[in-house]
């Protein structure tokens, strides 16, 4: 029996932190385990560019978040920050063919770094965009020259800090 979306969300602590931009876009985490993640995104008219296809910035955010969650699936108590990301746009993500699905994979990790990749597929299963990314595992985010602050915890979630 497949794991329920609620169980995945609970195990991942949602996305683990409150990310208002991800909430605004409406991403839905559907897989979070074993170095893999899957996020579903149904673009709305406000997510399109002047050619009436999904905006590249929305696709890059989807790729970034799917790679980050793939990295975090191995260490869900840690946060990650993007160090580097390279994106290739292969074909337009045309609305109406169904939701987009990003499949992130953790290819390698060290104690502090994660090396990932992700592909966004359209509703017909065609690859629209692909990215590779490097992420740093963090317990806290730096703020200022010599200070740190905690990650924004998701609503109803208990911080591990």
Briefly describe each language-model feature range.
Residues 1-161:
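Terminal targeting signals and extreme-terminal segments of soluble enzymes
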């Amino acid at each position: 029996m497949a794991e329920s979306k609620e169980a995945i969300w609970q195990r991942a602590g949602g996305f683990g932190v409150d990310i208002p931009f991800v909430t605004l876009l409406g991403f839905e985490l559907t897989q979070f385990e074993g170095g893999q993640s899957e996020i579903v995104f149904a673009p709305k008219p406000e997510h399109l560019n002047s050619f009436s296809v999904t905006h590249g910035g929305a696709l890059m955010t989807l790729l970034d978040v799917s790679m980050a969650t793939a990295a975090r699936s191995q260490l869900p108590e840690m946060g990650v920050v993007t160090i580097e990301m390279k994106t290739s746009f292969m074909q337009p993500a045309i609305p109406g063919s169904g939701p987009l699905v990003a499949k992130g994979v953790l290819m390698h990790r060290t104690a502090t770094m994660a090396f990932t990749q992700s592909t966004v597929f359209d509703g017909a299963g065609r690859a629209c965009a692909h990215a590779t990314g490097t992420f740093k595992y963090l317990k806290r985010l730096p703020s200022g020259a010599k200070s740190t602050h905690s990650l924004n915890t998701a609503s109803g979630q208990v911080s591990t800090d």
